[in-house]
């Protein structure tokens, strides 16, 4: 189960935290009376703790992203990752050569800017899901194309399947979230 919210990006960090807490409370109403704090792992992945005890809140995961005036969060009962991007013109072929597998770069060369963001948002969402960050997982990263050479709907990460789903966002943006799912080989 998950909850995905998209807002106009608030200017202040305190407002972003308030929106996140409201999304968490809407997802898990029994936490509405619990004082919560956000902490981060050494790699930067955020998680919730009880403000009173300092213990990690189990069974609730979240990921946030913002770009081009939008701010989004996903709250889930399992590990998840989210990336939201305003699709701005960029030197995407050079970025693809630097950060992507050769086959991903070839796909991007054919698919253009849209293709670049299809791979980039999956890569960022997966990096947030793993908690390792974009550069932290570089040696372990899977190719994000399927057998037909299109952006993957799911990839194998360690002993799990991670599924990618695009989120409906305004034109000119692309958002992808990922989560674990039971799948047969």
Residue ranges of predicted features:
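Core catalytic alpha/beta fold that binds nucleotide/phospho-ligands
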Residues: 1-185
């Amino acid at each position: 189960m998950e909850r995905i919210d998209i807002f106009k990006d608030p200017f202040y960090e305190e407002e972003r935290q308030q929106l996140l807490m409201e999304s968490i409370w809407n997802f898990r109403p029994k936490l509405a009376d619990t004082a919560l704090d956000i902490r981060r792992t050494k790699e930067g992945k955020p998680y919730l703790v009880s403000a009173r005890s300092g213990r990690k809140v189990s069974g609730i995961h979240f990921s946030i992203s913002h770009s081009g005036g939008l701010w989004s969060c996903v709250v889930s009962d399992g590990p998840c990752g989210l990336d939201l991007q305003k699709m701005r013109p960029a030197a995407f072929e050079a970025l693809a050569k630097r950060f992507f597998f050769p086959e991903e770069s070839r796909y991007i060369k054919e698919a253009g800017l849209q293709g670049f963001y299809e791979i980039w948002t999956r890569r960022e969402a997966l990096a947030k899901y793993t908690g390792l960050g974009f550069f932290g997982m570089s040696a372990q990263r899977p190719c994000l194309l399927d057998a037909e050479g299109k952006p993957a709907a799911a990839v194998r990460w360690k002993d799990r399947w991670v599924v990618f789903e695009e989120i409906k966002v305004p034109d000119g943006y692309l958002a992808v979230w990922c989560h674990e799912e039971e799948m047969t080989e």
